[in-house]
Amino acid sequence: MQKPLTLFCLPCAGASATMYIRWRRLLPSWITVEPIELPGRGGRMDEFPAESYAALTQSLCDELVPSLPERYVLFGHSMGALLAYGVAQGLYARRSSMPIALLVSGCAAPSRQDSQRYNNMQSDAALIADLSRQGGTPEEVFDNQELLRMTLDLLRVDYRVCGSFEYAQLPPLAIPIHSFGGRADEISAARLNDWRLESTQTFTLDWFDGGHFFLRQSEDWFMYVLKKRLMDSRIEVFSATLTSA
């Protein structure tokens, strides 16, 4: 019988962790999908959203540490990937139980982040243009002024979080990093490849048809590859255990 594995999932900018709920029926039962909701959205709508990358990642570590499972993986898409990296580094600094892998989707490596890009997109017009370009927002959001206002306000705050990120050359993580990219996304292969610099272990980069939201546009294939990477991570942990025994 497969030993259980918890998959913690962090959302992209302007979104709720509910974007991952459907994964619970798309992935096998040995994978427990645990979406991590951020303040100011979804079930935490009544909380003030964080506006600092450092404060948000520290808060996420505070929430996770008391109940970390035996085997878990951190996954994030876009902003969520950058947060997942910060959480992994924060857990390492606290000498907490580490994830068996870090999975980063649709996000340039920490050393290749363009913080100024986010700082330049604070007006409604700039945010709407960015949403339209990325293609992940339903048309009904653009057609409903109330929904659009909520989305823009949240996206603006999330972009401030991304804009506050400052890269520091911390020790590479001693866990595998698996990166995922869209062939039609604006993020170049070089910026995705540099995730390899953040790990002393296995690094992979998988490509999918689609733009920034390739994980929806190529969902079936993405789910297949995601499951494979999770299985690979379990095997690496098992092999390491045998070697050290």
Language model features by range: what are they?
Residues 1-245:
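Non-catalytic, mobile gating and regulatory segments of ester bond hydrolases
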